């Protein structure tokens, strides 16, 4: 599925009165867990954006994986530049809560990241994830290369067959390439569950294994 930002504005009923900002929100450019930069050129590393509900729990899933160099919480897929959390939660910017995952493909494969993505949430729920309801919680994969797009699309077909067998409905995950702009969330949301170990995490998978072929 290839959607333009203009199409997304219509789809999510973006409030055109929300004009956003011309400059990024302030960012402490140091990962709270591993000390690596959150924002960088990341030369020699690969990048992908995953949205699977609230980005607090989603980010923790990925920073724990060997081969993941950095992660950051942010917003993407909408029509308002540099939005705030409050604006995104209004449902009027069109953005999804996403996690930017920067990884070393010689240590962890893209297929391994996809397996974590599919198995860690319910991709059939549309504009919600568990008790978290709203367009910002939709399931998305924003690809930075055509190879990622092909692999993600193929994995969706494989996982759909497995979900069908288990009695689930159609996957609603958006897979986009090229990736829309990623806007870093406020500092308080970065690595939130490392700063607040008892904080809220509403993620929950289907219990269905994603049996895609892993390239290791």
UniProtKB/Swiss-Prot annotation:
Has an important function as a repair enzyme for proteins that have been inactivated by oxidation. Catalyzes the reversible oxidation-reduction of methionine sulfoxide in proteins to methionine. One of its GO terms (biological process) is cellular response to oxidative stress. It comes from Xylella fastidiosa (strain M12). Belongs to the MsrA Met sulfoxide reductase family. It holds the Pfam family PMSR. GO terms for cellular component: cytoplasm. It catalyses: L-methionyl-[protein] + [thioredoxin]-disulfide + H2O = L-methionyl-(S)-S-oxide-[protein] + [thioredoxin]-dithiol; [thioredoxin]-disulfide + L-methionine + H2O = L-methionine (S)-S-oxide + [thioredoxin]-dithiol. Keywords: Oxidoreductase. It is an enzyme of class 1 (oxidoreductase). InterPro entries: Met_Sox_Rdtase_MsrA_dom, Met_Sox_Rdtase_MsrA_sf, MsrA_MetSO_reductase. It comes from the Bacteria. This is Peptide methionine sulfoxide reductase MsrA. The active site is at residue 54. Its EC number is 1.8.4.11. One of its GO terms (molecular function) is peptide-methionine (S)-S-oxide reductase activity. Disulfide bonds: none annotated.
């Amino acid at each position: 599925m290839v959607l333009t930002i203009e199409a997304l504005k219509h789809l999510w009923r973006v409030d055109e009165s929300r004009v956003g900002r011309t400059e990024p929100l302030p960012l402490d450019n140091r990962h709270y867990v591993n000390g690596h930069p959150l924002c960088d050129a990341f030369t020699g590393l690969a990048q992908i954006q995953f949205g699977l509900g609230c980005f607090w729990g989603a980010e923790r899933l990925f920073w724990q994986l060997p081969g993941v160099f950095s992660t950051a919480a942010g917003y993407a897929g909408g029509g308002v530049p540099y939005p705030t959390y409050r604006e995104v939660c209004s449902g009027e910017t069109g953005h999804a809560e996403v996690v930017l995952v920067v990884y070393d493909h010689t240590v962890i494969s893209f297929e391994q990241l996809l397996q974590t993505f599919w198995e860690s949430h319910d991709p059939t729920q549309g504009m919600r994830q568990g008790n978290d309801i709203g367009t910002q919680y939709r399931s998305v994969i924003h690809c930075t290369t055509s190879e990622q797009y092909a692999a993600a699309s193929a994995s969706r077909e494989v996982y759909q067959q497995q979900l069908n067998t288990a009695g689930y409905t159609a996957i609603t995950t958006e897979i986009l390439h090229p990736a829309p702009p990623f806007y870093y969330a406020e500092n308080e949301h970065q690595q939130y569950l490392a700063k607040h170990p008892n904080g809220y995490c509403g993620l929950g998978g289907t219990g269905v294994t994603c049996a895609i072929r892993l390239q290791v």
